[in-house]
Amino acid sequence: MGTINKKLKDISPIAVEAEAGNAGRVVYDLKTGVLKLEKELVSLPGSKMPLNLKLYYDVTHGGWRLNYEQYLTQKSQIAEWESGTDKPDVIYTDGKMEDRYFYAANQVVHESSLSDADASDYGYFENETCLNIKQTSTGWELEDLSGNVMSFDGNGKLCSVENVYGHTSSVTSGTITDGEGNVCTFERSNGGMTVEIRGYNKRFELLPVTVSGSSGWYMLAEYKAEWDSSGAVLQKSCTDRSFYRLQNNSLACVFDGFTSVEATYSNNKPSVLEKKEYRDYGASVSGEIWTLSLANGETTEKYTDFTHTADNRYSYKDRKGIKTEYGLVRYDSNHPDLLKYASITVDGLCKAPDRTVTSNYLVESYVPNLGTVTDFTTISVEDEIERMNINYDTSAITNKNGLTIAMFNLLSSQELLNMFLGMKKGTRIISVYMNAFCYDEGAMPLKFRGYELKNLAPVVCTDFRDEDGNSRYKTYTVYQVDFFGITPYALKETTQLVKGNKRYVSYKYYNSKFELVKEKGYDGVEKQYTYDADGLMTGERVGSDTAYVKTDYAFEQKTEAGEKVYEEKSTFYVDGQERSARNVYDGKKELKYTEDAKGNKTTPVFANDLLTSIKVNGTEKTSYEYENNRLTKLTHNGTKFRFGYGLGYLGSIGYETLNSLYNKRIESNTLTLSSTDDEKTVQYDTDVNGYVERYTYDKNGRLLGKKEKKAGTSSYASVIENTYLEAEDGGLKPSVLEEIVDNKAGLKYTYTYDKNRKHATKVTVTNTAGGAQKYVKNISYDGYDRVTTENYGSAIYSRTVSYPDSNDSPQERFERVKHTVNGISASNTTYEYDGLNRLTKEKVGKSSSSSSLVFENRYEYYAGKSGTNETTGLVRKEEYYLKNITAPQGSIEYEYDANGNVTEIKNLLDTGKNVSYEYDSLNRLTKETNFAIGNEWRYTYDNGGNITKKEEYNPATYCRRQ
């Protein structure tokens, strides 16, 4: 989380490590106060619990030994466990030494009735990830939940390791095999030791040597080695070499033979490493480089060379904590592994963005029975240094699953982020619940509430500012990844929009295949999606539990005309009836044909991967022709269009045939490029009567002007002229339209923008002749770039739009529209919506007061299948109410066909005023019968879809009216 100060890189909550060159590393265990020197040789594979072979200098054993570092705690060393306390490293649960658990993988939980005030206190083991130790006839077995087993003899000596795949690593006095072909052999001779690892071509030699006549030295060398068929060393080359001096059977000095670094131990005890020096072998000291002393509960580490110095100081008391000049780490008094408190200086942590989008690594989570965190301290920011504080309260909030909550403060220069960490005691952090307290005056805390355990997730913050640099609103997006399969969502993208004291949430949830399965916008409407094993959508649902639209898709394999096909069936609900549409795919899962709810079958035909024809119910409706893979001709219902090309661009569009004499349509559309410096593009549109329109564009594709030439004339007359403001400030101020001159209307429109040219705030209209002003239109916007007011002067006309939550909501739907004429309120319209954002009520009054209501419109929508809450977006009924009258004064009901076309509008209060509509197979209106006015109209179309005839009939006599 953030970049930790480099001075803390070598500080671990458990140990401070100092490299001793190739000789190995010095490990100072902060919880035990023991300092030891070790050199790792190799880790054999073949098990989830690998054999880590190390050379370890042990004063108790009087020298160097090959070490596996497997420790067992004796029964006599274990204090009696009491309810409410943490257990020691190893706990014997039954007193018979039959079952034991390693603390690092398990813990005892003490619950104080977090969920039930009447429950009694109790303690128990939570062993989901435990290591179990069992006594056998020959010794002990250590087994994890995966089935990996380590066997020890009665003295605690490791004998073998068997993994879940049946591979066994056996250990004898001279040979270690891992069951997969890797062999390690070692032998002692003449006070030394030789280790060979054939699988890695490595050989280690630990031999007593004499240096400058001085005894007590050992040489440790590592070689790249090869062996012959008899097992003898064929050749070897040294890669590492170090020398160790023993005095009184204790380690006194370590010398790295390659880097000339020597480490000297004080009082011949490996628990006190006094200094580490640069020197030549056998020569005098050439420069002090590193010292470490341990006295009176304080450790001082000093680093010095010829160019710079650095001092780190550590202090501890009762093994509870380590205090450094860079930070503080404190551990629980009952167990040194349990983090209690930490304060660490970090660089660049959680900087709040300024007009830019940045990623801040924060996280969120959920832990059952959180409890209450109290009495924590907020740190101040000094010199803009961010500080990370952890306050770990182990007693107040630990749930029955062993999860413990810590408070986590992240302070930046603009925000305070409060986070709660959930972790298994003595192990790693697994989740966080986060609050961000904005410094913006009046702002509410940003809150992300988790629902499962999470890994770290970045939070992306975007600050939207107005032209004056003031924050209008902020969005915070967190991406949460579930690596463990705990939830059905592999990825969650959650965005909070914060404005003032309002907060709105939108989200998108993805499954493990990264298919979108759930989403919700700021309007609160939720959408859900389901898929089959092949990733094809099987259903979608939009809306709330009481009002939603649902469509089901079925994708299955069938046989049609002896051919294997796949059918994708869409089932939806209209007018209380189930309707279905189909897409049928061939064996390659390429679209074969579609079938709508009325049974009309549309079939695409391809040749050389190009669409050549579209047929409806076997009749060709559209055909396509190509040259060099470019479309040159399109025929639709008998009307043919042709396309011409210039140098790589579409140059002309025209009709090859004209099927109608009733319409003056464009016959050709030609694009040409001029040779002027700005590369203006000119487009000519010509109709059948010779009328030509000429459009001119600049090199950026912006329309500069429109001219027309009437039939029989030779010159063009200007119709429209546009001018633009060019971009400034490196594009921060974009190019925008400045003026429009409409020569036909004799008017000029001039646009005024805010200083960032984001919005047009004023439109001034003048006469082109004389320049007299006609009117000025003023426009205002809210923080979400929506128009809120339009006025032409307070004495003329104004329109004010209000959105939910007094314009603090990002929703696009209107909540109120107010009209004012000549300074007097003309109307005030309010809107209400259901869970699908469908308009349910429209109230019109003279003011916002309910007493000023003039009339009200109410809307109802069609339900779906019988007995369900499924709903469509089709209006079923519209009712009109007058003020103070409970009965509707107007009631209209709508009916639709299977394609959603309105077929009848019924006047429920006067059935003699109904209106009906009829359509052809292409959903074109062919007849309109209006009994309210006693008229009927019939429409005829050409093959291009143009109305060629409109005839009027008397619906009572069916006679055509002349």
Stretches found by the model and what they are:
Residues 1-13:
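Short, intrinsically disordered N-terminal pre-domain segments
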Residues 20, 64-68, 192:
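Extracellular secretome segments
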Residues 20-41:
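N-terminal-proximal low-complexity accessory segments that begin disordered
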Residues 29, 41, 70-72, 131:
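Ubiquitous "structural anchor" signal
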Residues 44, 58-59, 67, 249:
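A membrane-pore/channel beta-structure motif
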Residues 50-57, 65-75, 81-87:
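Solvent-exposed N-terminal domain segments of exported/luminal and surface proteins
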